[in-house]
Amino acid sequence: MEQRYLEALEEEKILSTKIMELKNLEKKVNEETGEEYGSYLYSTKINLLELKLNKVKREIKDWEGF
């Protein structure tokens, strides 16, 4: 079970990185187009990854509670 804790920590890092990259892409596209086109393209994916990240963070918190 400790293996899952380590996997969750790694997954948290990966998800955080992906979210940050997508937010940067979103900002770049918005600046290039002068519109909210980047938000249109990336907001759903970012939201889904943030939900998954929150789930992983809760799992990590549960593990740290033991």
Predicted regions and their residues:
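Short, charge/polar-rich alpha-helical segments
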Residues: 1-17, 43
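Amphipathic alpha-helical coiled-coil segments
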Residues: 18-22, 44-66
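Charged, low-complexity interaction regions
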Residues: 28-39
